[in-house]
């Protein structure tokens, strides 16, 4: 007996990492075999050289692209519906119709350019350019464009009959790791509440990790997205469902983020630090896709959906307190993480190293300027019951290592007031 529970290793999507890797985009689209391309992004990024570069590369390869720039921070179901309409317009100009998305073509000789499960011969491919908002919205759009589902019916538990359109993810932040997951988070503005969209077949066909595209990020965005990635890695490592493969990836991601986030915040042109952060964020995404997340994300998503707080900001506010809450059941793992965080002492006890890990996370948060509290967003004790209700209904709690009662969540929130 190995002493290790069985688990599945499914390393997807195919990822291209390195400065200049965006040049591979036309070849990746060609491998998918799409007849039209829609770039999914946000309004701010649409006017930058990043999107201009993407569209120019595609145009030079005789792959003219339509740009949909209607994604908002914390994207909504309205964004998804508008994006699906833009895709329908793009498809109308292609030789195929949207129903052809159900076709599963024979793998091409160039198949290694994309993940083996990626649909080929689809009429439209989506290129999601941006942070987690653009990539998450693209997953909803990829489904809604070929299925009659809108609004809350986009929930990941809903049945879809036609496979999602293929997505190529081009992250421009080192944060959410959304490019490594088949699922995303969008807000239903009618509630308002965030929920999960996606399906097994909405995993990006490929992702392009070009650190040059992250150089223009301002310090506050670099800090917030970096803390998002750190939360992903830590919650993966502390998950109720760990495995040795994900453990190794998560610990290395923690190590890379702790070592490079301050440098990237201090000097946004530091390409070495940017490269380490972008790869680490992707690794954290791979790890969490195999283990799930936890309480920090459950609470953070309520804050994002109801108060429009950016994910990295919400998570960084909560992370040290959630780590302390998990300490009784994850002492050894936090002790192990202390060494990845640069705070471990080989002569210290597990208890002391675990505490040092939490202190190191809090210190890193302060160092990169993430000092906000939930009270700064107008959240009061009167809101705690709603946040608690949202958090306890979040699917990620299936992976949290220590079950939380309503009183536990209220206490965590009270510490932020």
What is the predicted function of each stretch?
Residues 1-93, 118-125, 374:
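ATP/NTP phosphate-donor binding region
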Residues 78-85, 89, 119-212:
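Glycine/threonine-rich beta-strand-loop-alpha-helix active-site module
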Residues 154, 183-291:
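Carboxylate- and glycine-rich phosphate/diphosphate-binding segment that chelates Mg2+/Mn2+
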Residues 175, 282-315, 394-399:
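Glycine-rich phosphate/pyrophosphate-binding beta-alpha loops
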Residues 240-249, 264-276, 291-296, 347, ...:
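Flexible, glycine/charged-enriched surface loops at secondary-structure junctions
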Residues 380-417:
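Short, amphipathic C-terminal "tail helix"
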């Amino acid at each position: 007996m190995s002493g290790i529970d069985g688990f599945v290793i499914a390393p997807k999507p195919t990822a291209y990492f390195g400065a200049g890797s965006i040049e591979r985009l036309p070849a990746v689209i060609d491998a998918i075999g799409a007849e039209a391309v829609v770039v999914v992004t946000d309004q701010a990024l649409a006017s930058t050289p990043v999107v201009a570069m993407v569209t120019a590369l595609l145009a030079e390869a005789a792959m003219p692209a339509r740009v949909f720039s209607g994604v908002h921070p914390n994207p909504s179901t309205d964004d998804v519906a508008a994006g699906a309409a833009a895709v329908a317009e793009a498809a109308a100009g292609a030789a195929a119709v949207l129903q052809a998305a159900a076709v599963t073509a024979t793998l091409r000789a160039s198949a290694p350019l994309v993940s083996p499960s990626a649909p080929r011969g689809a009429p439209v491919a989506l290129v999601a350019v941006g942070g987690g908002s653009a990539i998450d919205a693209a997953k909803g759009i990829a489904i809604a464009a070929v299925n009659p589902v809108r609004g809350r019916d986009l929930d990941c538990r809903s049945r879809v009959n036609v496979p999602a359109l293929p997505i190529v993810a081009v992250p421009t932040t080192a944060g959410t790791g959304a490019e490594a997951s088949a699922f995303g988070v969008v807000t239903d503005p009618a509630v308002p509440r965030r929920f999960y969209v996606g399906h097994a077949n909405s995993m990006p066909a490929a992702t392009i990790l070009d650190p040059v595209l992250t150089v223009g990020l301002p310090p506050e965005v670099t800090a917030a997205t970096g803390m998002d990635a750190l939360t992903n890695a830590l919650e993966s490592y502390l998950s109720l469902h760990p495995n040795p493969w994900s453990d190794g990836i998560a610990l290395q991601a923690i190590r890379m983020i702790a070592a490079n986030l301050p440098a990237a915040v201090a000097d946004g042109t530091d390409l070495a630090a940017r490269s380490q952060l972008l790869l680490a964020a992707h690794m954290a995404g791979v790890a969490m896709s195999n283990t799930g997340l936890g309480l920090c994300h459950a609470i953070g998503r309520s804050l994002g959906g109801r108060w429009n707080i950016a994910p990295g900001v919400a998570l960084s506010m909560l992370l040290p307190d959630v780590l302390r809450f998990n300490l009784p059941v994850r002492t050894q793992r936090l002790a192990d993480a202390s060494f990845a965080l640069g705070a471990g002492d080989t002569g210290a006890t597990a208890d002391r190293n675990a505490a040092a890990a939490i202190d190191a996370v809090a210190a890193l948060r302060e160092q990169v300027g993430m000092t906000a509290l939930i009270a700064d967003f107008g959240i009061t004790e009167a809101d705690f019951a709603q946040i608690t209700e949202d958090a306890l209904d979040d699917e990620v709690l299936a992976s949290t290592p220590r079950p939380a009662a309503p009183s536990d969540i209220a206490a965590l929130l009270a510490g932020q007031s």
